[in-house]
């Protein structure tokens, strides 16, 4: 993962934010924008995890309330050498998952009931390993900063539109041009930067997640099924809060309008191809069939009481022992 590139992109967003502040209030406005950006990121650093979990009405679970799901995450965290994160369930039909938290010691992972119901245990393990990889790579903090700055830039762009820019510094045509730049170009640029940061980190999390769960094909199979599910099962909460879309393993937005054109995630087929190549290099060829052959569970799923097919393969079980066993 290129941390230098990420730092440069975040710096670029900060410059955009300060530039809009300058258009609104000259040098003083620029400094105020900088102070606001710092304050928002400090607030996001300490509170972003609580905010997003509350936004999606996530329910915290433990070994008693969700034994198999909790133990799976515990085993994967041990594989990764991470502290045990808090574990959440989101009551949402669309299969998806995300991680949040400012550092590995204050991390949380969340999966939707749609994910736990529709995917095999192997696939769920691949997904949760991917989310733990984000925690280990500290992507959750980076993306919180990026999302905060992107939201702030859009907010200031709207202010510039309504206020018409700084009257003293932007009269006539230049004032109109400056306002248009603040209203359209800066938020658009912030969105592009946000996507660039998100996409580079997804590939790294896929690779590390495959290492954590031990089988890249579990994750590749899961990505395909989640992507198909996201196209036909809307996530209403995500549609209302599109700034959080980058947090999920697959873009939860429905694809209406410009969602597909400006995706926060790399192309799913490219991610699957990279994982399949990784599996081939590891000499793993048959695990994908085990995962893909598992019928979607319509029972209690691997987070609650053990269902008949919770092991993933009703024909004698999986050849591969996963961390849920």
Curated annotation (Swiss-Prot):
Membrane topology, from the record: Multi-pass membrane protein
Chief site of localization: membrane
Keyword Kinase: no
Gene: htpX
Family statement drawn from the similarity comment of this UniProt entry: Belongs to the peptidase M48B family.
Keywords per UniProt: Cell inner membrane, Cell membrane, Hydrolase, Membrane, Metal-binding, Metalloprotease, Protease, Transmembrane, Transmembrane helix, Zinc
InterPro entries: HtpX_protease, Pept_M48_protease_HtpX, Peptidase_M48
Protein's name in the database: Protease HtpX homolog
A GO BP annotation: proteolysis
Active-site residues, Swiss-Prot/TrEMBL: 131
Residue intervals passing through the bilayer: 20-40, 145-165, 173-193
Binding site for Zn(2+): 130, 134, 202
Gene Ontology cellular-component terms listed: plasma membrane
Cofactor descriptive note: Binds 1 zinc ion per subunit.
Enzyme class: hydrolase
Biased composition (Low complexity): 306-325
Named cofactor requirement(s): Zn(2+)
Taxonomic lineage of the native organism: Bacteria, Pseudomonadati, Pseudomonadota, Alphaproteobacteria, Hyphomicrobiales
Any GO MF annotation of the entry: metalloendopeptidase activity
Ranges where the record places region Disordered: 288-325
Keyword Zinc: yes
A Pfam family assignment: Peptidase_M48
Subcellular location: Cell inner membrane
EC code(s) of this entry: 3.4.24.-
């Amino acid at each position: 993962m290129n941390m230098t590139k990420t730092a440069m992109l975040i710096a670029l967003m900060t410059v955009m934010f300060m530039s809009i502040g300058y258009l609104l209030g000259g040098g003083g406005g620029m400094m105020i924008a900088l102070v606001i950006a710092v304050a928002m990121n400090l607030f996001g650093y300490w509170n972003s995890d609580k905010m997003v979990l509350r936004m999606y009405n996530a329910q915290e679970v433990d070994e008693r309330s969700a034994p198999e799901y909790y133990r799976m995450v515990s085993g994967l965290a041990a594989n990764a050498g991470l502290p045990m994160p808090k574990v959440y369930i989101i009551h949402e039909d669309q299969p998806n998952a995300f991680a949040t938290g400012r550092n590995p010691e204050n991390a949380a992972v969340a999966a939707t009931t749609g994910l736990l119901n529709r995917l095999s245990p192997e696939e769920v393990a691949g997904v949760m390993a991917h989310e733990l990889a984000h925690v280990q790579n500290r992507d959750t903090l980076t993306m919180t900063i990026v999302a905060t700055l992107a939201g702030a830039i859009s907010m200031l762009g709207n202010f510039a539109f309504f206020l018409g820019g700084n009257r003293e510094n932007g009269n006539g045509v230049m004032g109109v041009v400056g306002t248009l730049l603040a209203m359209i170009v800066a938020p658009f640029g912030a969105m592009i930067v946000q996507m660039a940061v998100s996409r580079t980190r997804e590939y790294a999390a896929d690779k590390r997640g495959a290492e954590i769960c031990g089988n890249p094909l579990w994750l590749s199979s899961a990505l395909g099924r989640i992507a198909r599910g996201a196209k036909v099962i809307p996530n209403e909460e995500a549609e209302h809060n599109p700034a959080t879309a980058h947090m999920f393993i697959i873009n939860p937005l429905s694809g209406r309008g410009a969602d597909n054109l400006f995706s926060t995630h790399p192309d799913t087929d490219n991610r699957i191809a990279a994982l399949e190549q990784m599996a081939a290099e590891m000499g793993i060829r048959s695990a994908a069939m085990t995962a893909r052959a598992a019928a979607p569970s319509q029972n209690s799923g691997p987070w609650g009481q053990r269902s008949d097919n919770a092991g993933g393969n009703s024909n004698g079980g999986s050849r591969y022992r996963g961390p849920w066993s």
